[in-house]
Amino acid sequence: MSERTKATLDEFFRRMSTGDTDGATELFADSVAWDIPGATDLVPWIGPRRNRAEIREFYDLLDKGLIKDRFDVERVFVDGPHAVAIGRLRSTIRSTGKVIQTAFSLEFEVDDDGRITKYLMLEDSWHVANAVLP
């Protein structure tokens, strides 16, 4: 299972690095436990999602809301169907011009079919929320 998990995440990050968000979305299962905790009243792209259509909406809102300057995955740890990726990101909020620079971790679970069933992103949500404020 660890090899399947690693292969799925390698493909996910490869697609993301080329801007293929449609392709990355296809790697998710039909039903997903997705969350990016934070101030959902201020930041429209964060919060829970439950299926591919909602994940697609996330990427659309993200692209409208910010410019992705960097998204560097530094390490990926895999244990069976579970994985954690850690890294750093830098983005610019389109509406304010403010920069978000933060470490992040991503928790994943991958099923027997190689589909992502869990995605939990942890980042400096306070910094993100303040960056969208004028």
Label every model-predicted segment.
Residues R4, D60-P134:
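A beta-strand edge to alpha-helix "cap/lid" segment located at domain peripheries
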Residues M1-D30, L133-P134:
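Short, low-complexity N-terminal intrinsically disordered segments enriched in polar/charged residues
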Residues F12, A24, V32, N51, ...:
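Hydrophobic pocket/interface hotspot
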Residues M16-E26, P48-R50, I67-D72, M121-S125:
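Phosphate-binding glycine-rich loops and adjacent basic patches that engage nucleotide phosphates
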Residues M1-S2, P44-P48, G97:
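Alpha-helix initiation/capping motif
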Residues D10-G19, L42-I46, L61-L66, I86-R88:
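Short, mixed-charge, low-aromatic patches
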Residues A29-G80:
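A solvent-exposed, acidic/Ser-Thr-rich amphipathic alpha-helical stretch
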